[in-house]
């Protein structure tokens, strides 16, 4: 209380130094009940005592006066009077209205409030530390004086001496910040050691220490200039941060503590030099000769035009010519900037402005990878494809607005007369990718007449199944018929007489299965004397079905006079596009497949010359638009019940395809589906060609809801808008499974594939789990993830493959496998 009283009086008016010289130290303060304030300074007259005769002042005089730098205290302070009820209610109403109004704080105000709050926290922490330090000093003084067992006088004298020594050290460690008139009094009062002095107060240096602490905190938090900031940063760098000072920086990028990678890169946000050095805050701009920021060439066109206009006004003849040169230079600069700009997407650039980086991004966007020499860049749209105008018109009439990924990459390569191997997933648009270059190729050959029509077709397309061959025929007629070309399909199931009648007028393009085409060649129904374009679609499937020998016979029957050389000339587009001896051109061979088994590689190495390899996506992976679901359902009855639940849910619209493994089961499942109330047809190898075509036609037209088929329909069959594929029995290998689920999700549309698994499917569980893991929209069920057969790849079947390949060449002893 005494220290507070003296500090208040000292804050109001400092006492004159002449009155304090030579006086003994002030006596200790009296108790609170007998407290008498010190007499007022002589320079100010005390206010008159309040008279009881005068009436109380009106409420307007009781309002607080404007803020003054210092308030009178003690006897000079005005005596507060009672407030009226109206004033209290008025103040309360004004306070409520002020509190209800939203108060906007600027950034500087928010920073000021944060600094004040931080200063108060630091002051409170420092006050606590000083209190603890004083407490330790007092305890140490008592213990050092005989553990407190000495006399009271000795204990008090020892306490006073220890306090004076500690106080002297503390005052000497701080720089005086108070008024000059009060320094001597404090020093004399602290340095006096007379026997008649009483004990000092418990915290005599609190005000000085607190004042010094506030000043230091304010100096640390808000330095006066940039030099103090830089000095503080250097001090922190070499001496370390203070104990209670946060080292968090909002600008510095934070890294996770669990991250093990070492970061070798430097981020611009980690530069803290602009915080303390103002030279880094303002970027220096180049000032060159001439008007404008860059010597007459400003970044905006308006400044350039203004400069050119000023030149023209100054000198109409020479200045006008110079102005036109400046405008032309600015235009060229903008064109160069647009050509070399990295911020534009490849779709916004012109073809001549595309750089190597843009083509890499383009290929990554469409998941295109190419291999081979002298491969041209892909096409971004149909207008850049270099196709003839009449063919482009047909493409737009058919409704092909944007090319697919395989069409973007394969068509420019095929137009250069290069041999090609295309590896793409099912439903990716491969048919148009090889049909369009084929039509361009044969359009440069002379049309067939009465003499040349007997020499055979210009091109043949091989397909593994009848359905796929007929599907390619339908697609080819869309483009070939408007151009005046004839397409004929030769497949099994139809009589040779009927197909011979279709070939009576000749045909430029023949689509055939390998077995039936070999029969036609051996029976002299067809010759390949002028065939110079060969396409093998689903080549891996043809090998799986045992057509390898038939394919070799067909390729050996081709003429050798126009075969490409196995040299670097095979990669030269101009050399391969030349005509040989008038009408003949070099033979061009293309192969499309979903996988690349060794037998397919062997055929490609024998008959293709320096082929370019185009891969869309990853080999053997499913289409990304198909959601794969796997359910463990054991037993035929439970699977039929689950199939009924799926069909009756109404989640999937027809058509729906259900795959089984054996023909007998195919008819049984179709019969059960009819009992469920849905129309169904079957498709398997025992059906005649007419029955197959009728079944596919009913599904495509919408007359039938469900198609139940074996793996015969798993390759190349295009039924539009299939929403669901159900694998009633899991396929025997992962390749067949991939082609099964590829019947849905075609042409960029989404689809769902549901597979019923059992313990009998352990050979394919590992590959199935890997395929589900790679899919971004599919989920691996826990039962499959933890299954023993899914932990490692099955070794079953490799021994059987060795038996087939050894000794009998796949016949005789190995045929039973």
Swiss-Prot record:
Gene Ontology biological process terms from the UniProt entry: mRNA processing; RNA splicing
Extent of motif Q motif: 380-408
Biased segments, Polar residues type: 1-10
GO cellular component, one term: nucleus
InterPro entries in the cross-refs: DEAD/DEAH_box_helicase_dom, Helicase_ATP-bd, Helicase_C-like, P-loop_NTPase, RNA-helicase_DEAD-box_CS, RNA_helicase_DEAD_Q_motif
Recorded GO MF terms: ATP binding; ATP hydrolysis activity; nucleic acid binding; RNA helicase activity
Residue ranges, compositional bias (Basic and acidic residues): 118-135, 780-790
Biased composition (Pro residues): 13-67
EC number: 3.6.4.13
Keyword hit for rRNA-binding: no
Domain (Helicase ATP-binding) ranges: 411-614
CDD domains, A to Z: DEADc_DDX23, SF2_C_DEAD
Catalytic activity: ATP + H2O = ADP + phosphate + H(+)
Alphabetized PROSITE patterns for the sequence: DEAD_ATP_HELICASE, HELICASE_ATP_BIND_1, HELICASE_CTER, Q_MOTIF
Annotated SUPFAM superfamilies: P-loop containing nucleoside triphosphate hydrolases
Bias type Gly residues, positions: 806-817
Start and end residues of each Helicase C-terminal domain: 625-788
UniProt region (Disordered), positions on chain: 1-86, 118-225, 778-817
UniProt motif DEAD box: location: 537-540
Regions of compositional bias (Low complexity) in chain numbering: 205-218
Domain notes: The Q motif is unique to and characteristic of the DEAD box family of RNA helicases and controls ATP binding and hydrolysis.
Role noted for this protein: ATP-dependent RNA helicase involved in mRNA splicing. May destabilize the U1/5' splice site duplex to permit an effective competition for the 5' splice site by the U6 snRNA, resulting in the switch between U1 and U6 at the 5' splice site. May also act to unwind the U4/U6 base-pairing interaction in the U4/U6/U5 snRNP, facilitating the first covalent step of splicing.
Subunit text: Component of the U5 snRNP complex.
PANTHER family in the cross-refs: ATP-DEPENDENT RNA HELICASE DBP3
Protein family: Belongs to the DEAD box helicase family. DDX23/PRP28 subfamily.
Protein name: Pre-mRNA-splicing ATP-dependent RNA helicase prp28
High-level lineage: Eukaryota, Fungi, Dikarya, Ascomycota, Pezizomycotina
